[in-house]
């Protein structure tokens, strides 16, 4: 009989809204903790986000990691002001291809939970409180 560790998926994707030095809070700490847990089990998850401005930053926990990103990454101010593209974010997260993953884990306060998965993929979503800044600054959005 196979043990539980034999059945643990090796192709795992870890999805978050964005990796940015301008946005580090509880949700980002949750992603870091999930990543650390998976790595302790011998699995380095494929990271994915709408934008990534962290993996190239010296001292970041993501330094040197490969992060799949959405088309927002290449738009003007996409990396520095991703929230300005709020109406496009649900569509953008659907453009991230995670077809190779057996397990998709999303950490979401906005749209990461909307990443597309296939019928053979298990998707577990850690859903944080709703996007408070959009309510607090509703006229800006």
Task: Name each model feature, range by range.
Residues 13, 46-48, 124:
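A structural signal for isolated positions on well-ordered beta-strands in alpha/beta enzyme cores
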Residues 27-38:
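Short amphipathic alpha-helix
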Residues 11, 102-103, 122:
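Structural motif
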Residues 40-111:
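Active-site donor-binding segments of glycosyltransferases and PAPS-dependent sulfotransferases
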Residues 6-24, 50-51:
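Nucleotide-activated donor-dependent transferases that construct or modify glycoconjugates
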Residues 72-79, 118-141:
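Acceptor-binding helix/loop patch of EC 2.4 sugar-transfer enzymes
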Residues 22, 113-115, 133-134:
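Glycine/Thr-rich phosphate-binding loops of Rossmann-like dinucleotide-binding domains
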């Amino acid at each position: 009989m196979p043990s539980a560790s034999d059945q643990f998926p090796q192709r795992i994707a870890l999805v978050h809204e964005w990796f940015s030095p301008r946005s580090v809070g509880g949700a980002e700490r949750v992603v870091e903790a999930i990543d650390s847990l998976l790595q302790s089990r011998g699995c380095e998850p494929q990271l994915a986000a709408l934008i990534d401005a962290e993996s190239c930053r010296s001292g970041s926990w993501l330094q040197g990691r490969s992060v799949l990103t959405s088309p927002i990454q290449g738009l003007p101010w996409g990396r520095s002001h991703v929230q300005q593209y709020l109406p496009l974010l649900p569509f953008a997260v659907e453009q991230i291809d995670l077809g190779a993953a057996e397990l998709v884990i999303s950490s979401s306060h906005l749209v990461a939970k909307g990443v597309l998965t296939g019928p053979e993929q298990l998707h577990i979503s850690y859903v944080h409180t709703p996007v408070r800044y959009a309510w607090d600054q509703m006229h800006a959005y």
